[in-house]
Amino acid sequence: MRGNIAQLMQQAQKMQENLQRAQEELAKLEVTGTAGGGMVSVTLTGAKECRKVRIDPSILSDQEMAEDLIAAAFNDASNKIDAESKDRMGSATAGMQLPPGMKLPF
C-alpha cells in the first residue's frame, strides 16, 4: 500500500513538472488565424493575447465584412491555440490516469 502511495506521489510530481513545462511552452507560442482567404490575419499568443492584426486594404470599404472577417480570424487563431493546448497538456499527462470527468487544461 505504501509503495502505491509513493508511486502515486512520484507520478503526481512528474505530471506537475510536465504541465508546468507545457504551460511555459504555450506562453511562448504564437498562432495566426486567417479569414477571407488570407485577407485578414490575427496573431495570438498561447495566452490568447493579440499580437498582430493584418487587414487587406481592399476590404476596408465594407465595414461589416471587415468586422466579420476580423472576428473569424480571431476565432480561427483561438481554436488553433485550444487544439495546441489540448495536445500539449495531453502529452504532459501521458500514461497517467486522471479521475473520471477531470479535463485538461485545468
Swiss-Prot record:
The keyword Ligase is annotated on this UniProt entry: no
UniProt-annotated location(s): Cytoplasm, Nucleoid
GO molecular function, one term: DNA binding
GO cellular component: bacterial nucleoid; cytosol
The keyword Cytoplasm is annotated on this UniProt entry: yes
Short name of any one Pfam family annotated for the protein: YbaB_DNA_bd
Region annotation Disordered: where it falls in the sequence: 80-106
Keyword terms, alphabetized: Cytoplasm, DNA-binding
Membrane-crossing residue ranges in chain numbering: none
InterPro entries, alphabetized: YbaB-like_sf, YbaB/EbfC
Compositional bias ranges of the Basic and acidic residues kind: 80-89
Major subcellular location class: cytoplasm
Family that this chain belongs to: Belongs to the YbaB/EbfC family.
Subunit and interaction comment: Homodimer.
Protein role: Binds to DNA and alters its conformation. May be involved in regulation of gene expression, nucleoid organization and DNA protection.
Record's protein name: Nucleoid-associated protein XAC1110
Organism: Xanthomonas axonopodis pv. citri (strain 306)
